[in-house]
Design a protein with these regions (language model features):
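Hydrophobic anchor at the start of a short beta-strand
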Residues: 61-64, 109, 191, 291, ...
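Hydrophobic alpha-helical packing residues
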Residues: 52, 56-57, 184, 335
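A conserved, hydrophobic alpha-helical segment in the catalytic core
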Residues: 129-139, 179, 208-242
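Active-site beta-alpha connecting loops in nucleotide-dependent enzymes
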Residues: 175-176, 265-345
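Conserved catalytic-core segment of NTP-binding enzymes
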Residues: 134-167, 171-193, 273, 305
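Short, basic phosphate-binding NTP loop
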Residues: 1-40, 47-51, 59
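Gly/charged, well-structured mid-domain segments that form the phosphate/adenylate-handling core
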Residues: 224-262, 267
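ATP-dependent carboxylate-amine ligase catalytic core
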Residues: 27-33, 54-135, 139, 143-156
């Protein structure tokens, strides 16, 4: 046999052996984690990850979590946040590394927020990396349209890539539920459609931030499927540390005047922003005598900025509008000129 051919043959065998070994190590890590909960969806992933972890922990489960939202964190066995310091750009490959790391502790459950946006990577993450026992798709909304498609149906189909085979799917999505039902049926997965109708005002009391009822409803449903009572799950969720990007209200005093600042920057699509606006309109501690809106724009998301400005003009109707970003001249005539109060613009530079 030619030396070059023989060397190539040995190299190929070595690569195959290495890949097989890596796959075996990963499968062994998964076997050490009997309950694997994978959280996907357009909005609420980080919050639901934290709520489920807290509900399980309250019931005595040993549980680890990982969020990838505003500020990626590990949620350790005691429920404390451990900041993730990345030395390179985030990639879905880190899910494998963290699953192996988590497997060393042999927890009863791991709750992972999905990192992938592009459809093919969502498939790889679920079907080859996580292999979840419980999948959660919070909702399907018009976001990341460049990667997932410009129609809600396209986005729902993309998100459905994280529906497992022979597992459980929990979702609060209503408009595109039929898509999830169809995909789940082909994969012999049971669908648990959840609404927030059963979440009362009393249930929402005790949280140290503004939480969405549908996030709580989803998290309760997952906990109940694992034998945890609704009351016990809620008790744990109220103790959960909110995500850095969670919806919160800060009371400020400036020059003898009182202001309330609502941090809603994590909601960067029109539907989610409108939902939050409707929530805070009903909040008893907020005075709507004078409303200011602050919009942070991105030069690579012109369509998104236009949609949010349209929503601000139509629904919020602020007395003042503050906009940060570059190349904002395109918004002046169609939007800024229609604001009833003053408009302040801030450059990124």
């Amino acid at each position: 046999m030619d030396v070059v051919v023989f060397s190539l043959f040995i190299m190929i065998l070595t690569v195959i052996a290495a890949l097989t070994g890596e796959w075996w190590v990963h499968l062994r890590a998964l076997k050490r984690i009997p309950i694997r909960i994978h959280i996907n969806g357009t909005r609420g992933k980080s919050s639901v990850t934290r709520l489920i972890c807290a509900g399980l922990r309250e019931a005595g489960f040993s549980v680890l979590g990982k969020t990838t939202g505003s500020d990626p964190r590990i949620l350790d066995l005691e429920g404390k946040d451990r900041k993730i310091h990345r030395l390179q750009k985030p990639s879905i490959g880190e899910q494998v590394r963290f699953l192996r790391y988590f497997g060393q502790f042999r927890p009863q459950a791991v709750v992972l927020e999905c990192m992938a946006v592009q459809p093919q990577y969502q498939w790889i993450t679920e079907q080859h990396m996580v292999k979840s026992t419980h999948s959660v798709i919070t909702n399907a909304r018009l976001d990341h349209v460049e990667e997932m498609g410009h129609r809600l149906r396209d986005i729902a189909m993309s998100l459905s890539n994280t529906i497992p085979f022979k597992g459980n799917l929990f979702t609060a999505e209503q408009d595109k539920l039929e898509i999830f039902n169809e995909v789940a049926a082909k994969r012999r997965t049971e669908v648990h459609a959840v609404t927030d109708h059963g979440v009362s005002h009393d249930d929402m009391m005790g949280f140290n931030h503004i939480e969405h009822p549908e996030n709580v409803a989803l998290s309760i449903a997952v906990c109940e499927s694992l034998g945890i009572s609704r009351e016990q799950a809620l008790e744990g969720m109220r103790k959960a540390q909110p995500d850095p990007g969670a919806l919160r209200i800060w009371d400020l005093e400036m020059d003898g005047r009182h202001f309330s600042l609502v941090n809603a920057f994590a909601a960067n699509d029109p539907q989610s922003t409108k939902t939050i606006w409707n929530m805070i309109k009903e909040h008893p501690s907020l005075d709507h005598e004078h409303t200011c809106a602050f919009l942070n724009t991105r030069s690579d998301r012109v369509n998104r900025s236009s949609q949010l400005l349209e929503l601000i003009l139509k629904d919020i109707k602020p007395d003042s509008l503050f906009v940060r970003g570059d190349k904002m001249e395109r918004f002046e005539k169609p939007f800024f000129s229609k604001v009833k109060g003053r408009v302040e613009q801030f450059s990124e530079n």
